[in-house]
């Protein structure tokens, strides 16, 4: 997706600076594909190795710190250069901009299938007007009848406010500036951390929507059968005015929807390359995996997403979950020279929130 306007403004029209933020995206996409095995985040240059990119990005980030701080290192030692308050401020300002440059692409990949993301400025709230999904009543009438059943539709207005979220990490200025702690690696881990938490919150909002007592029972299936799933999919599709549906769930949830072995599998035979393929859809309806997310608890090694729910959504209709990001990432920290080991606690602040708000009809299957 295009670079955010705030990043372009932060670069100040400097093409070299803008290339640094584009390079961070390239490095991140390469890492997610080569190390995490997650493709589709975005295109990247595969002619340069990941290790080489990491070193180049670290140096490019330090150059950007020089530009933003207005304090070029020149022939100064790292110790002397790092004493400048401007250098410390610029380091985290650049890190914040790097996070904002990469994060939108990661969100589209992980939650974009069911979440619509919006960006607002600091101090702003997001306002929505939800239009009714129902159609007008068509009735038979005699030749002399002047009016039929009168129907008036009303839109619903909703407001949404972001909530501040924080990450506190300890860094050592000397190690960062001397290359012992890689800035590119630090940014990458920060992006993954924020994206994981946003993924969990967006999914929890979706899960809470169908668990709500007011969610129609006609759109819930307790247990899976092909016939009932087809009926539910047809219902959702019809009430969304023909918008094609898809089945969404974690890999384990989707697995329980695969064809029964006793009924046979779909087999593709070719004289040169015979193969057996897993069915990727049901009657031309797609089956889409929602990537599972770790809870982050290394005592239980739990998973955050429900492995027993499959959601039936119309992909062409309005998305059921809305997300908002307020402003850009901000960081506050104590001074490195307040501690003997030149360490600093840096707290990154990211304001975002999610809400279930849509006129679309959706269903859920418990498997």
Located regions from the model:
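N-terminal alpha-helical "arm" segments
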Residues: 1-78
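Short amphipathic alpha-helical coiled-coil/interface segments
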Residues: 58-61, 91, 95, 187, ...
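Sequence/fold signature of self-assembling virion shell proteins
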Residues: 54-58, 263-367
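Intrinsic-disorder-associated interaction segments
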Residues: 1, 10-17, 21, 50-54, ...
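Assembly/oligomerization interface modules of large self-assembling protein complexes
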Residues: 76-165
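Extended, solvent-exposed, turn-rich assembly/linker loops in the middle of proteins
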Residues: 211-283
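Alpha-helical scaffold segments that mediate packing/assembly in large oligomeric complexes
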Residues: 164-239
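Short, charged/polar micro-motifs that form catalytic or ligand-binding hotspots
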Residues: 47-51, 55, 76-89, 173-184
């Amino acid at each position: 997706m295009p670079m955010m306007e705030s990043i372009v403004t932060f670069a100040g029209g400097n093409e070299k600076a803008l290339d640094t933020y584009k390079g961070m995206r390239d490095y991140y996409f390469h890492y997610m594909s080569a190390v995490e095995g997650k493709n589709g985040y975005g295109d990247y240059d595969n002619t340069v190795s990941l290790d080489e990119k990491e070193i180049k990005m670290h140096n490019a980030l330090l150059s950007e710190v020089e530009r933003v701080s207005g304090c070029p290192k020149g022939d100064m030692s790292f110790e002397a250069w790092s004493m400048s308050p401007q250098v410390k401020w610029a380091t985290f300002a650049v890190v914040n901009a790097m996070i904002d440059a990469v994060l939108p692409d990661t969100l589209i990949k992980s939650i974009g299938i069911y979440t619509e993301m919006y960006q607002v400025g600091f101090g702003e709230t997001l306002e929505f007007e939800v239009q009714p999904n129902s159609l007008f009543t068509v009735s038979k009438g005699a030749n002399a009848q002047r009016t039929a059943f009168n129907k008036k539709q009303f839109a619903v207005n909703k407001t949404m406010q972001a909530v501040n979220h924080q990450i506190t990490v300890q860094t050592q200025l000397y190690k960062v500036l001397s290359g012992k702690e890689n800035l590119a690696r630090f940014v990458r881990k920060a992006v993954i951390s924020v994206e994981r938490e946003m993924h969990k919150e967006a999914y929890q909002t979706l899960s809470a929507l169908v668990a709500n007592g007011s969610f129609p029972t006609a759109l819930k299936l307790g247990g899976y059968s092909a016939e009932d799933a087809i009926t539910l999919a047809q219902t959702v599709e019809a009430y969304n005015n023909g918008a094609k549906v898809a089945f969404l769930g974690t890999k384990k949830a989707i697995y329980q929807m695969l064809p029964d072995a006793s009924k046979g599998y779909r087999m593709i035979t070719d004289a040169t390359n015979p193969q057996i393929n897993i069915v990727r859809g049901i009657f031309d309806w797609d089956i889409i995996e929602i990537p599972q997310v770790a809870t982050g608890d290394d005592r239980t090694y739990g998973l955050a997403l429900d492995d027993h729910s499959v959601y039936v959504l119309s992909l062409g209709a309005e998305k059921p979950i809305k997300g908002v990001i307020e402003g850009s990432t901000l960081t506050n920290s104590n001074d490195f020279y307040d501690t003997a080991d030149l360490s600093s606690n840096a707290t990154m602040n990211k304001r975002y929130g999610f809400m279930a708000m849509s006129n679309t009809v959706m269903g859920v299957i418990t498997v």
